[in-house]
A protein has these predicted regions:
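N-terminal accessory regions of nucleic-acid-interacting proteins
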Residues: 1-92
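Short amphipathic alpha-helical segments
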Residues: 109-110, 161-163, 247
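Acidic, Mg2+-coordinating catalytic module of metal-dependent nucleases/exonucleases
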Residues: 198-266
């Protein structure tokens, strides 16, 4: 990944600093301190002690350096997960969308992953139980990506994978579109949001849901190749549509911060 885009909202972000939330961040923007460079160049920031400012200056300089070399794991460690969406623009080219199918049960009650779908904007691929799905193959498939996009993955997909495949690592920032939508007061599952934003699905799987995916797997276990193909198409649509939805929600979240208005006029 090359240097980040100049308009990326991450460089307007102060909520990555300990003790600064969205409210104080907006207060800082109102003082015409809009970027990390603005902050570090200011001799003082109202409401922040000189000692604290020196600490923040060091942290922002470090963040700037890590961003310039594309070290996304650094930001996964220092930022609250609910703010990981702010990194989407800079790491989109290194992002991978992930969606899993299961047999319908939790891991501690006989549950297991049937399919893991991965899409990076260029290629969709699948890891399938009994064929090529292992902790090693999943780690290899995730290797090199800098950013994770899921729908409800923070609560379901990632914990399920971690419980099912010890040794699998998710150390990169995670943009969970379900919680991003809720932040925007848009409720509902993935299919509802796709309909809301006009995102189309392949006709052969239109109307299918997670329970249908469970039933399809039952047929796959019996050797039904048509069911296997349908299950993979269903997962492919789930996974590929995440990137389209991420584009939409990122822009809405960015607009909701008000930063564009602050940048446009340089004031409140």
């Amino acid at each position: 990944m090359g240097p980040e885009k100049g308009s990326a909202v991450i460089r307007n972000t102060f909520s990555l600093l300990n003790g600064i939330g969205e409210k104080l961040e907006r207060t800082i923007w109102k003082k015409k301190v809009l970027t990390w460079d603005d902050f570090c160049a200011s001799t003082e920031i109202e409401g922040i002690s000189p000692e604290r400012k020196r600490i923040y200056d060091d942290q922002l300089n470090q963040a700037s350096m890590e961003l310039s070399v594309g070290n996304s794991e650094y930001f996964a460690r220092i930022m609250k997960r609910r703010e990981h969406w702010r990194l989407f623009d800079v790491f989109k080219d290194g992002a991978v969308c992930l969606d899993i199918e299961t047999n319908g049960f939790q891991p501690d009650h006989g549950g297991y992953v049937t399919v893991v779908g991965l899409y990076d904007g260029y290629e969709w691929r699948s890891l399938i139980r009994g064929e090529n799905l292992t902790a090693e193959s999943l780690n290899n498939a995730l290797k090199g990506y800098k950013y994770l996009v899921t729908f409800y993955g923070a609560a379901f997909d990632v914990p399920f994978l971690l419980r099912s495949f010890p040794g699998v690592r998710f150390d990169i920032p995670h943009f969970d579109l379900c919680f991003a939508a809720r932040k925007l007061e848009i409720n509902g599952g993935l299919k509802k949001l796709e309909t809301l934003f006009g995102i189309e699905r392949d006709d052969v799987v239109k109307g299918l849901n997670g329970y249908d995916a469970v039933k399809l797997w039952e047929q796959v276990k019996k050797g039904n190749m048509e069911a296997r193909e349908l299950l993979l198409i269903y997962n492919k649509e789930d996974t590929m549509n995440l990137l389209k939805l991420a584009d939409i929600l990122y822009l809405r979240l960015k607009n909701a911060t008000g930063i564009e208005e602050f940048i446009a006029c340089g004031c409140a």
